[in-house]
Amino acid sequence: MPDVTVKPLRSKANAVINLMGALGGLISLALIAVLVKEQGSYLPLFAVVSGLMLLGLVIFLALVKEPELNRLREEAERKYNITDDGKDENEGTEKLGRSKLVSMLFLLASVLLWYMAYNAVTSSFSVYAQKIWGIRDGSFSLPLMVAQVAAIVMFIPVGMLASKIGRKKTILIGVALMIFAFGAAFFLGSNLFGVKIDLSEGIFTEPMFYLMAVFFAVCGIGWATINVNSYPMVVEMSKGSTVGKYTGYYYTASMAGQIATPFLSGLIMDEVGMEALFAYAAVFMVLALVTMLFVFHGDSKPVPKKDKLENFDVD
C-alpha cells in the first residue's frame, strides 16, 4: 500500500485494506459457527479457508500491476508537489533524526503492546468463553463476529477522522475504547460485583449477552481505529527507498507481540485462572496508551489541493 499510495492518503488506503481483512475474518468466524460442531472435526474449516487463500493469491497475481501503480503514484507526487521525505536534521540520509528515532521506538513499543493485548484475547477466547461463560460449540465465535462487524463499519470513517484530527489522536481514542471494553468484559467474567454471566443455556436467552455484545462492538471500533492509523504512522517516517525496511519494523513489532502473548498470558492464567484474560489485555492496553503519548512524529500532514488529489483517477 505505501509503495503505491501518496503519503497524505495512506490512512484512508490502509482503512480499505483493513476493511477487506476484517471481511475475511468475518467470513472465517461465520465458517467456524457453521462448520465446527461440539467436539467436531476442524478439517472442513481448514479445507475451505485454504481454498479461499489460494483463490486470493490467484486474483492478486492476475490483477495487481504494481509497477504501473507505482508510476501513477510518482506522477501524482510530482503533480501536487508532494515530497516523500520528512524534513529533519538528517534529511538526505537514510538515518532518522534523534527526535524521529525516539518517536519510532515508542510507536513500535505501542504496536507490540496493543498486539499483546488484543491477540491474548483472540487466541484464548474460545477456551475462555467455554470455561467462564459456558458458551458451547462454535457459538463462541459470535462475540468476535460482533467486534468484526463493528470494525468493518468503522474502518472508512476512522480513516477520514484521522485526516481531520490526526493519526495520533485517533489512535489514542481507539486505545481508550479498548481499555474500556476489556475492563468491562473482565467484570462480566469475574463475579466481583455479582454480574458474572452464564451462557450455558443459550446465548440469545441471556440478557447479559447483549451487554457483552456492546462491549465487543466497542472493542472492534477501538481496534479498527488503531489498526487503520498505526502502520501509516510508521511508514510516514520513511522515504521512498526505505518503505520496505519500515514495513519490516512494523511487522516485527506486531508479530513479536502475537508470538509472545499466548505464552505469557497462558502462564498468568495458569497461576491465577482464566478470569485474568481480560484484565491482562486491559493492562497491556494501558501500557500502550502510555508509550503512545511519547510519539510526536508520523502524523498525517495536510493534503495539498485536497479536492483534486482525493479524486485522483488511477484508471
Mark where each language-model region is.
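Helix-to-loop junctions at the C-terminal end of transmembrane segments
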Residues: 36, 153-167, 193, 269
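Short amphipathic helix-loop junctions that connect adjacent transmembrane helices
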Residues: 123-140
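Cytoplasmic membrane-interface "Motif A"-like loop-to-helix N-cap segments
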Residues: 164-176
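C-terminal ends and interior cores of transmembrane alpha-helices
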Residues: 176-205
